[in-house]
Amino acid sequence: MFSLSNSQYTCQDYISDHIWKTSSH
């Protein structure tokens, strides 16, 4: 696991990654 507050992973990145994963199915 990773900490959102302790990384450069932003909400936008999270959403984009989620969309990419869901659309790749």
UniProtKB/Swiss-Prot annotation:
GO terms for biological process: regulation of translation. It comes from the Eukaryota. One of its GO terms (molecular function) is translation regulator activity. The keyword NADP does not apply. Keywords: Leader peptide. GO terms for cellular component: cytosol. InterPro entries: Leader_Arg2_CPA1 (IPR013203). Pfam families: Leader_CPA1. Arginine attenuator peptide (AAP) that has a regulatory role in the production of arginine-specific carbamoyl phosphate synthetase. Encoded by an upstream open reading frame (uORF) within the 5'-leader region of arginine-specific carbamoyl phosphate synthetase small chain (CPA1) mRNA, it attenuates the translation of the downstream CPA1 ORF. In the presence of high concentrations of arginine, ribosomes translating the uORF encoding AAP stall at the termination codon, resulting in reduced translation from the downstream CPA1 initiation codon. Belongs to the arginine attenuator peptide family. This is Arginine attenuator peptide.
